[in-house]
Every structure is written in C-alpha cells, then in structure tokens.
A protein has these predicted regions:
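Glycine-rich phosphate/pyrophosphate-binding loop and the adjoining helix
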Residues: 28-30, 145-202
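Residues at the starts of beta-strands that form the adenosine-phosphate
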Residues: 2, 34-36, 133, 166-167
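Short histidine/acidic/glycine/proline-rich micro-motifs that form metal-
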Residues: 10-13, 88, 141-145, 176-178
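N-terminal beta-loop-helix "entrance" segment that forms/cooperates
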Residues: 39-61, 177-186
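A short beta-strand-loop structural module common to alpha/beta enzyme folds
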Residues: 33-43, 169-173
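N-terminal beta1-alpha1 ligand-phosphate binding loop
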Residues: 2-33, 143
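Helix-loop-strand module that forms the ligand-binding subsite of alpha/beta enzymes
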Residues: 64-156
Length: 202
C-alpha cells in the first residue's frame, strides 16, 4: 500500500509526528507499506500566490514556482492513501499546511462548457486524486475539544474539495508538552486502530 503522510507540524518528533507514525504502524499490521512522508517545514515549498496558472482559463500551465511541490503532486497521484497531520495553531491548521493545500490546486482540473458565442455556461472541477482514502491527525494543548472546531472544519473542507474519502480521524487533546502523547495509551491505540482500518477499507 502506497501512503503519503503530510506532516504539517514545524517540529519533528512532535505529538502529531508520533501519532502519524502510530497510524502507519497500524497500516503495517495489515499490509506492506511504501511510505512517502513529507515534512512540510523541511521541504522547499514556496508560498502560493494564487496566480491560477494551472487553470484552464489561463492555459493550464505548470506552476511557475518550481520547487519540491511538483514532485510531491506527481507522487501524490500514485498514492493509495493520504494522511494529513497538524497541531492546533491559533484554532486552525498550521500556516505550512494551509499553504500546502493551496499548492495542491493543480490537482483540480477544470472542465468548462461554452455556448456558441464562446461564453462559459458551465464549469466543474475534477480532482486528479478523487476517491483516495484519507486520515486526519490533530493534536492540541487545550483540553477542550471545542478549541479545534475550526481546525477540523478546515481539514474536512479541504478533503471534500479534492473528493478524498475520509476514513478516520485521530484527535488528541491536552498535550501540554512536546511528545506528551507517548504517555497516552488510549490516543496511541486510536491512531494504531485508525491505521489498521485505513489498510482494510476498500
């Protein structure tokens, strides 16, 4: 099974990183895994400028930024499942993951219909990664789950935009220290079981 895990925390070995690894262990308990783990903050991923170069309205050109994202998107299309992880930063996902989703826009291929005069009368997008399975992983300092209400909405909305099939969610609260989740057997088990489910759901 080919898995791409997108680590949206700026800290390696963080609670999110640990939980993502537990999800992957769960997948490995059911099937062989070919893992492609992306550390956003260690990658050369420039900020999206919203130029729309990829849009058919502007010639469906390649992204002009020319960084690591080109290869990431090509590999993403070959993945069987995607894992997106982020800590709660200001009640939402990290700036790095926000930009990552923006840079995924070339995965949305627009199809348009014109009338006899050339006016656009209908347009729709068809994601190149539609139907792929996805899991989200979230950690926060606050003990109140409601603190991540916006974050979870943002993650789910992005998955819907790309027509991904969310098959699981790992959500850990009260992580006051770095790597504290290592002490939380229930959260580690949830991550492992989510990975096992990801492996077997068709």
């Amino acid at each position: 099974m080919k898995i791409m895990a997108i680590m949206g925390s700026p800290r390696k070995g963080s609670n999110v990183d640990i939980l993502i690894d537990e999800v992957i262990k769960g997948v490995k308990s059911k099937t062989a895994v070919e893992l492609d783990k992306i550390y956003i903050y260690e990658s050369d991923i420039k900020y999206c400028t919203g130029c729309g170069a990829h849009s058919i309205l502007q010639g469906a050109k390649d992204c002009p930024l020319g960084d690591d994202m080109d290869g990431i998107l090509k590999r993403m299309q070959k993945a069987d499942a995607l894992i997106f992880g982020s800590p709660n930063h200001g009640r939402t996902i990290t700036a790095g993951l926000t930009n990552f989703f923006a840079r995924m826009m070339p995965m949305l291929k627009m199809q348009i219909e014109r009338d006899e005069e050339g006016n656009i009368i209908h347009a729709e997008t068809k994601p190149l990664i539609r139907g792929k399975k996805a899991v989200t992983v979230v950690s926060q300092v606050d003990f109140a789950a409601s603190s991540s209400a916006l974050l979870l909405m943002v993650l789910d909305a992005n998955l819907r935009d790309f027509h991904l099939r969310k098959v699981g969610e790992v959500f850990s609260t009260g992580n006051l220290k770095r790597a504290q989740v290592k002490e939380k057997e229930a959260d580690l088990n949830l991550a492992f079981e989510t990975g096992a489910r990801l492996a077997v759901i068709k």
